[in-house]
């Protein structure tokens, strides 16, 4: 087992933390019970979880639901780290990530150019995680250091789009960074 191999479990994962296309909206109280269950199961297995990842594979998260759920978790378990796994199915993924950033979340799942999806989401519009390059760009503009090179991420996103042969949902790969736009503007003025 993972324990026999010295692989500690450090994170619990709460699936569908913000809602489900089959069950509908899930109450904060239900999610808190699931967090408690994850914490209890870890202790029974001989581990202490350092964090909980809240997942939203079906795209239900909004800034308000992120604020409400993280606030409730932090009021009950202030020492627990929180990570977010957000999909942009309904166009609120980046806004939900922004809310998480404002609340001090430092771990986010993202995918190049928004690759991925949720095959069990019961909707035709289930897209992948928030776009890595879009999220890194937003962080950079906010003064949050990610250690990522946004220009290189844009190159990789364009390659990914070529490989899959269809448009992918990334934005900054089309619009470019503000740094690049400002440089182009200065060149035009100088000419």
Which residue stretches match the model-derived regions?
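Catalytic cores and adjacent flexible loops of soluble metabolic enzymes
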Residues: 1-191
């Amino acid at each position: 087992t993972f324990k026999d191999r010295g692989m500690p479990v450090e994170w619990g994962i709460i699936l569908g933390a913000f809602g489900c296309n089959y069950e509908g909206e899930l109450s904060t109280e239900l999610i808190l019970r699931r967090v408690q269950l994850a914490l209890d199961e870890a202790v029974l297995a001989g581990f202490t979880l350092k964090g909980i990842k809240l997942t939203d594979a079906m795209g239900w998260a909004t800034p308000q639901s992120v604020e409400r759920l993280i606030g409730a978790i932090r009021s009950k378990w202030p020492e627990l780290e929180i990570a977010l796994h957000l999909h942009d199915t309904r166009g609120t993924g980046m806004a939900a990530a922004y809310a998480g950033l404002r609340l001090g979340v430092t771990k986010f799942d993202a995918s190049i150019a928004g690759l991925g999806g949720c095959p069990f989401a019961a909707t035709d519009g289930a897209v992948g995680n928030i776009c890595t390059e879009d999220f890194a760009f937003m962080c950079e503009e906010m003064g949050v250091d990610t250690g990522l090179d946004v220009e290189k991420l844009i190159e990789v996103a364009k390659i990914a789009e070529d490989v899959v042969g269809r448009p992918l949902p990334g934005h900054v790969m089309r619009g470019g960074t503000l740094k690049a736009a400002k440089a182009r503007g200065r060149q035009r003025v100088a000419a």
